[in-house]
């Protein structure tokens, strides 16, 4: 798998941005210019005199309590409670479908003996006998009739201390409250054409969705929550619910303030966050009954969704913090089932989701204030994971669930394969949910949390909907991008920095566990993927890709790209094909430099060893051009470099391109490459060692230089990560099948990982030898 940076070099597709050329020209020529900078240019920091901004308020997420609204007559939507808040006794609400139901509610003050009172109901004076024997509570009484000229009957009284009442149309019925607070309950009346019932209110009221009925009942039994106690609450006309233009929209850009160079923009956005968990399951060596680790690891996810008719491309990174370590030990015998450590997230854990999309809001996210977010919750449920034992019934981990609740939002930086992105980090607190998790066929059961074994439960992603708002300081000219502090850093003492960085990198080799390096090295890596996990804060990472490409343009590898075809054909044609070379048999050891044995070759290239090494030095480029599916040496180089960059504290945007370029050329200097022809393999290294052998028996056969040169031109070239010496040793000691041999010859990462997880000493030692060469 050729690294991405080399693929671009091979196609001559590397480019230099015009802005970079202008920057270089500007660094060699200075000119005095006087401008009117405006109030923001007196300091390198963001201005501290911020404007007042605008408080966003949209209907993306439905409020629990909407109101208060003024008395009015309207047809309430089905499935919404009207919470009535009267201030005086009398008729508070009336409603009818004009067919078979006329219903009104009367409020009676405390301590009223039985008496007749006159009420105006549906425009008609009605004599109704009422009473309220309570000394402290108010009494709500429903009066109803089924014909227009019929008599009213009284129903469902509610004795209330908070003096609140509610009515709702839903499911073919009209629902109300009855009983006595604080234990009031709901009741209902049947009505045809219930959805056409018009309501007339004679007091202020609120609107509560049916999904929040428990809140409505809480208000009825207790009281309304205190709302903005320091301000006067003015009830609005109900028509205000329909005046969307008077509110800040869900997706809107608002100019808060503006000067000659800068302006403050408020961005309101709906967002759909999709994320998934990733995990790492490592099996211990031995007989196959033990697992060493089941852990969470960060997971990237890219997706598209529609926002206000526009397709948005988004990128999320999900990570967890505060994991709880559990273990299971079935016994001390080699055949006892053991999990040394498995991670579980619970109520003391946090989930972080970094979110970025390609909208205008994220283009200039450098100087930001008034950042706020409102997100829904989501429940994450674990699935089953089978522990495949060699013999006996398999234990399996099942269940577990947590709910994620928004706990804040901050700015963050995501490192993708190409650039760093200023993004939003949403923090979620956790609550444990049903069901609990267990390891079936063991004693472990009834534990709560979400284990790392199968956190996605077969889902492609989890989804959270919500919105965010922020005010960002951006250039007044929309074509400009906000400058980042490190993008204009002067390169001072660069060689000293590089020297210190080399020393630090090589010293880190003693601190990084070899198992960690092997685990990462066996992942298919592109050269730029090393940026995906850099922990150092590099504000100018957007320009790193361009800087690395510039370095490669001047490197020895890139300089030979343009003459790749000619070099290969020249190397192949310059190989002497005399009979003395072709007659060299298998009696010549594959590990012997035959230059001392062959003296009668009159060609300028004096031996098979130097001939094959001449070709093999160019095989690296040939391999990248042929795009084999396995791993290559550069993948291991990138993995080691990435791990060291992760742990480095001296990394800077100036030195990183130099380190990347130097590492790509100097890591793993002793390389070997192979071509496969049916069941025969021809292998040659940069050190002049060469050999040919059969796949099924690993029997050495004569090395045909002419055949090798022809195959190099026409066939895919593969990195010999597991070389012939290692393959033969593995076959002699363990025995491997033909398919396994082909997979190892192709450097299949999955097969290599299987051998590593089984703690195979021969394969592990070979990978360690390659990693140990990675020095700067």
From Swiss-Prot:
Residues 65-224 are annotated as: Spike head. Residues 248-479 are annotated as: Spike body and stalk (antigen domain). InterPro entries: ConA-like_dom_sf (IPR013320), Rota_A_VP4 (IPR042546), Rota_VP4_MID (IPR035330), Rota_VP4_MID_sf (IPR038017), VP4_concanavalin-like (IPR000416), VP4_helical (IPR035329). Keywords: Capsid protein, Coiled coil, Disulfide bond, Hemagglutinin, Host cell membrane, Host cytoplasm, Host cytoskeleton, Host endoplasmic reticulum, Host membrane, Host-virus interaction, Membrane, Outer capsid protein, Viral attachment to host cell, Viral penetration into host cytoplasm, Viral penetration via permeabilization of host membrane, Virion, Virus entry into host cell. Disulfide bonds join 203-216, 318-380. A motif (YGL motif) lies at residues 448-450. Pfam families: Rota_VP4_MID, VP4_haemagglut, VP4_helical. The record marks 101, 190 as: Binding to sialic acid. A motif (KID motif) lies at residues 644-646. The record marks 231-232, 241-242, 247-248 as: Cleavage. Residues 510-776 are annotated as: Spike foot. The keyword Cell inner membrane does not apply. HAMAP family: Rota_A_VP4, Rota_VP4. In group A rotaviruses, VP4 defines the P serotype. Some rotavirus strains are neuraminidase-sensitive and require sialic acid to attach to the cell surface. Some rotavirus strains are integrin-dependent. Some rotavirus strains depend on ganglioside for their entry into the host cell. Hsp70 also seems to be involved in the entry of some strains. Belongs to the rotavirus VP4 family. This is Outer capsid protein VP4. It comes from Rotavirus A (isolate RVA/Dog/United States/K9/1981/G3P5A[3]). The lineage of its organism: Viruses, Riboviria, Orthornavirae, Duplornaviricota, Resentoviricetes.
């Amino acid at each position: 798998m050729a690294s991405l940076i080399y693929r671009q070099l091979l196609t001559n597709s590397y480019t230099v941005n015009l802005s970079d050329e202008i920057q270089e020209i500007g660094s060699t020529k200075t000119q005095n210019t006087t401008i009117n900078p405006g109030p923001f240019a007196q300091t390198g920091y963001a201005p501290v005199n911020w404007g007042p901004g605008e408080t966003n308020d949209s209907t993306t997420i439905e409020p629990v309590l909407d109101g208060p609204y003024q008395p009015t007559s309207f047809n309430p939507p089905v499935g919404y409670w009207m919470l009535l808040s009267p201030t005086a006794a009398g008729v508070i609400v009336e409603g009818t479908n004009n067919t078979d139901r006329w219903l009104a509610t009367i409020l009676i003050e405390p301590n009223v003996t039985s008496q007749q009172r006159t009420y105006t109901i549906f425009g008609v004076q009605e004599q109704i006998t009422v009473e309220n024997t309570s000394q402290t509570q108010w009494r709500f009484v429903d009066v109803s009739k089924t014909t227009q000229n019929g008599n009213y009957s009284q129903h469902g009284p509610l004795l209330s201390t908070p003096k609140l009442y509610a009515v709702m149309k839903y499911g073919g019925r009209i629902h109300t409250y009855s009983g006595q607070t604080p234990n009031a309950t709901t009741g209902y009346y049947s009505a045809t054409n219930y959805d056409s019932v018009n309501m007339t209110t004679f007091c202020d009221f609120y609107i509560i969705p049916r999904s929040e009925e428990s809140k409505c009942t809480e208000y009825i039994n207790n009281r309304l929550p205190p709302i903005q106690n320091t301000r006067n609450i003015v009830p609005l006309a109900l028509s205000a619910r329909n005046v969307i233009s008077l509110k800040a929209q869900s997706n809107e850009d608002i100019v808060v303030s503006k000067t000659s160079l800068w302006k403050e923009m408020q961005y309101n956005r709906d967002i759909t966050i999709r994320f998934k968990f990733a995990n790492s399951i490592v099996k211990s060596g031995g007989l196959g009954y033990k697992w060493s680790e089941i852990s969470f690891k960060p997971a990237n996810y890219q997706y598209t969704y529609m926002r206000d008719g526009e397709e948005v491309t988004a990128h999320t990174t999900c990570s967890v913090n505060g994991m709880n370590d559990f273990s299971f030990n079935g016994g001390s015998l080699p055949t006892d089932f053991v999990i040394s450590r498995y991670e579980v997230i619970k109520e003391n854990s946090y989930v972080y989701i970094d979110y970025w999309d390609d909208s205008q809001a994220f283009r200039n996210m450098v100087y930001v204030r008034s950042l706020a977010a409102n997100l829904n919750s989501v429940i994450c449920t674990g699935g089953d994971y089978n522990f495949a034992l060699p013999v006996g019934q398999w234990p399996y981990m099942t269940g577990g669930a947590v709910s994620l609740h928004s706990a804040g939002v901050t700015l963050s930086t995501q490192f993708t394969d190409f650039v760093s992105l200023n993004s939003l980090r949403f923090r979620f607190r956790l609550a444990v949910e049903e069901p609990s998790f267990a390891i079936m066929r063991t004693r472990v059961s009834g534990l709560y949390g979400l284990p790392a074994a199968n956190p996605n439960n077969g889902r492609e992603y989890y989804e959270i909907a919500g919105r965010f708002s922020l005010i960002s300081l951006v250039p007044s000219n929309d074509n400009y991008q906000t400058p980042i502090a490190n993008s204009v850093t002067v390169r001072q003492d660069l060689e000293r920095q590089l020297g210190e960085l080399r020393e630090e990198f090589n010293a880190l080799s003693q601190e990084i566990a070899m198992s960690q390096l092997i685990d990462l090295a066996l992942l298919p890596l592109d050269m730029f993927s090393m940026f995906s996990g850099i922990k150092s804060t590099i504000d100018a990472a957007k320009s790193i890709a361009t800087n690395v490409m510039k370095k490669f343009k001047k490197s020895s590898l890139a300089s030979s790209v343009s003459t790749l075809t000619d070099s290969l054909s020249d190397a192949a044609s310059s190989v002497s094909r005399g009979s003395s070379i072709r007659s060299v048999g298998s009696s010549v050891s594959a590990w012997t430099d035959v230059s001392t044995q062959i003296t009668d070759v009159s060609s300028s290239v004096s031996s098979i060893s130097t001939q094959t090494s001449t070709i093999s030095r160019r095989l690296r480029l040939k391999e990248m051009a042929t795009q084999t599916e396995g791993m290559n040496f550069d993948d291991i180089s990138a993995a080691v470099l990435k791990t060291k960059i992760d742990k480095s504290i001296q990394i800077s945007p100036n030195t990183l391109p130099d380190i990347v370029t130097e590492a790509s050329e100097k890591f793993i200097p002793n390389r070997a490459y192979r071509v496969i022809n049916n069941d025969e393999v021809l292998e040659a290294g940069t050190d002049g060692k060469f050999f040919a052998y059969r796949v099924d028996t690993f029997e050495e056969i004569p090395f045909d230089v002419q055949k090798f040169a022809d195959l190099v031109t026409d066939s895919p070239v593969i990195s010999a990560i597991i070389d012939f010496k290692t393959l033969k040793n593995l076959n002699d000691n363990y025995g491997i099948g033909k398919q396994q041999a082909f997979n190892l010859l192709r450097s299949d990462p999955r097969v290599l990982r299987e051998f590593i997880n089984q703690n195979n000493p021969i394969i592990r030692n070979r990978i360690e030898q390659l990693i140990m060469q990675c020095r700067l």
